[in-house]
Amino acid sequence: NKMGKAHIKRLAAPKSWPINRKTNVWVLKSSPGSHTLGTSLPIGLIIKEILGYVKTTKETKYVLNQKKIFVNGKLVKNQKLPAGILDVVTIGEDNYRIIINQKGKLIPVKINGAESKLILKQVENKKSLKGKKTQINFTDGTNLLSEEKYATGDTIVFSNEKIKEHLILEKGSMVYVLAGKQVGKIGIIKEIQEKKGLQPSRVTFTQGKEDYETSKEYVFVVGKTKPLVTLEK
């Protein structure tokens, strides 16, 4: 089934996609890559259905051929390329950051040109190489060679592809919850409970006057006292 490879049935599309499930049966599917289906949106879906820059797939391909669409500053030629949570999507002069709201929906929010230069990447794991170099692997599939000390779960902030800041996953850091019951919430870490064995590590964070708990793997450090980027519409 040719349609099945590039498309999925709307009713089977991830719940995180903010789409109308009752129109055409099929919806564009992301190409496999750095992001899972539920944590990213295909570029074609963003520019056609969600933001309405174009009305047809033919128009989408035309705009891509004009070399005006970028994700995190890199040119996009394929409409199936996924843009994930906190990625920056540039369409001509307009910039958007993909956020996840408290209903668990992925939403592109408009940001200014200065903010569009800020890219946040979370450390997934590290690999020691010969010499003193370490390969830092990020959750978006990219990597970096470095001699600096970065831990799994930390965030590295890039500006114009240069490292601007290192945000540590620790008590007092500001985090954004990407999944689970507390999805979309932003708060300050109160406690990290490292678990051994089969139990996952947990994070207790404070938002306003309330404390919440979530899995450590669901949190993304976004600042020290306030978020460095737009996280709400």
Language model regions located:
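Ferredoxin-like alpha/beta domains used as RNA- or RNAP-binding modules
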Residues: 1-233
